[in-house]
């Protein structure tokens, strides 16, 4: 069974890291409205653009999404 993007992102958490994807994961953990079951790029991207003040650049999401795709293949 394929994991959701959120489930993958939680594997990237590291509160002591300066890596932007890991910081994104740390912040998403505390986002109670994050679409936790989604595997859809457009749905998650739209959500982040509208709601994620903790994400300074969408290029961080793009990098995290690429890591997700690589891990799922």
UniProtKB/Swiss-Prot annotation:
It comes from the Bacteria. InterPro entries: UPF0346, YozE_SAM-like, YozE_SAM-like_sf. Disulfide bonds: none annotated. Belongs to the UPF0346 family. This is UPF0346 protein Lreu_0775. It comes from Limosilactobacillus reuteri (strain DSM 20016). The lineage of its organism: Bacteria, Bacillati, Bacillota, Bacilli, Lactobacillales.
């Amino acid at each position: 069974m394929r994991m959701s993007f959120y489930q993958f992102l939680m594997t990237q958490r590291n509160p002591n890291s300066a890596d932007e994807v890991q910081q994104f994961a740390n912040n998403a953990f505390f986002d109670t409205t994050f679409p936790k079951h989604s595997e859809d790029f457009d749905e998650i991207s739209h959500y982040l653009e509208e709601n994620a003040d903790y994400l300074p650049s969408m290029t961080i999401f793009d990098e995290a999404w690429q890591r997700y795709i690589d891990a799922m293949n």
